[in-house]
């Protein structure tokens, strides 16, 4: 169906249904307090797990909400850094590389580049290429980490969960901020944000945010450079109709490093020596990652007189990526590493569309909050790939300036993906009980077109995803729950014969409990789960073709505490236990643990605000992150050494000395400058963790 006809038909259908249905009044913009008979609950609100604003304590799924205050205080410069204190998450998959937001959820690394959503729509990157997209945290209001399958609402997604980003929207109260920052490794940059109404009637508001950042990479001489803007506009067309517009031009002319080095030489000595954690194995003239992202989108929402609402979200993106990389390819002799070359030129366009209708009806004593939706995704990526070889390099005494032995064209492809999904969700309330039922039907088409060899591989699949969950709200703030959900993950990955792999499928059982002390400002949660996924797409080395294996199982425990211990003291703590193993695979891998999945993780962040006295306005904070049990390869040949990282912040609000709106902050990550290896893909590719980072900033809010 042509896109224009699809949009018209689905929008018309939603409007007709919404106009015809009667029911109880339901607010267009959900509040944080919900009432059902005598039960009143006040809780932080999430929307990532249900697509509707729902109190977290009424949500029968593990959800973590990272506020802007949290990730700014911790000095996060990427989404993966912003979620590093969150349970169920491993954000150090490729160590010090800042090129992509790798976020491993519940041990599943196959979706670590494809599980991010912005304002409810999938980011639409192509993980079978180098066209993976990022959004800088400067443009975000909050981040929700939804753990466990989300296919019932979002279609294709990892069984480990999703990361739902919310962008900063225009406000009708005028204000803004200007920020300057600088630090070690030649870090420097600036950012601004300004918002306010455009008319006296407060019908139209606008926001313009922008930033630039530059740094020397840990792996000199590579650089990291970024420029981005986000203009947005909100128009209250009527008292019941609202339109939000946004754009996001983003440029990374220098994408830093993405290097991997052998286990011998990084984790353990090789020939009596260890490679420096700043060693660059490439060639400056042949190493570059240039990414250009351009997004435009809208969200239009209308509230009917009967309390039902209809909305449509759409985003279009176009990206261009250029990659040149010289990489290590194993030891040649006692000191020298072999080197290969990989290059790619990519142009991708995509559209994501979601039509939603929601409202409430009562059937006797049960209230039904219904959501009906139709969404559509269309992505096309044109890629041209090159490979080659470079002369070896001495890893302990490198000399640069080599020219390639050869570089040759090896692929010219077009990756196409289309998905149409129809979904229904019913959030039922009866006294203190909460029931959630959901179902979704997907039609997915994937094509890989090999232009170089005039061949193609196609895959057309239909799938049904389901979810059922039960939760009970005790009057003391305790809410136990049990849930079952399924996952559906088609990809454009191809095997050695060029055939598109069968979609991965998963199912999860999860049980947990949430606790919010009455009258307090704290949230505690605990969850246990088991996820089974079949048709796993995997490969031995980053340069190998993909292959499909039978089944992988992830079992784990997650604990989280977010607490304001007083008006001045805030605590964020988490613990994660993950046991993810191949259940049906080759005899060598059977029962082995998956890579990129720590067995144990623990973290805590404590901050203190001085409210009075000579030090009024001072903020002190520190965090600790512990990681244990990362395996070296799929055969579990070794286990990487555990590591502990310490972070800290010192901030000062200069308003206390009469400089209204002015503040300063110093962030230090990896305070002890610990040298460590964060993860390995195999014994040939291990990734150093980030060295110490020191950044000072000055901000003026007005």
From Swiss-Prot:
InterPro entries: Plug_dom, Plug_dom_sf, TonB-dep_rcpt-like, TonB-dep_rcpt_b-brl, TonB_rcpt_b-brl_sf, TonB_sidphr_rcpt. Ferrioxamine binding and uptake, in association with the TonB protein. Its main location: membrane. It is a multi-pass membrane protein. GO terms for biological process: siderophore-dependent iron import into cell. GO terms for cellular component: cell outer membrane. The keyword Transport applies. Pfam families: Plug (PF07715), TonB_dep_Rec_b-barrel (PF00593). One of its GO terms (molecular function) is signaling receptor activity. It is found in: Cell outer membrane. Belongs to the TonB-dependent receptor family. The keyword Iron-sulfur does not apply. The gene is foxA. This is Ferrioxamine B receptor. Residues 173-702 form the TBDR beta-barrel domain. Residues 55-168 form the TBDR plug domain. CDD domains: ligand_gated_channel. It comes from Salmonella typhimurium (strain LT2 / SGSC1412 / ATCC 700720).
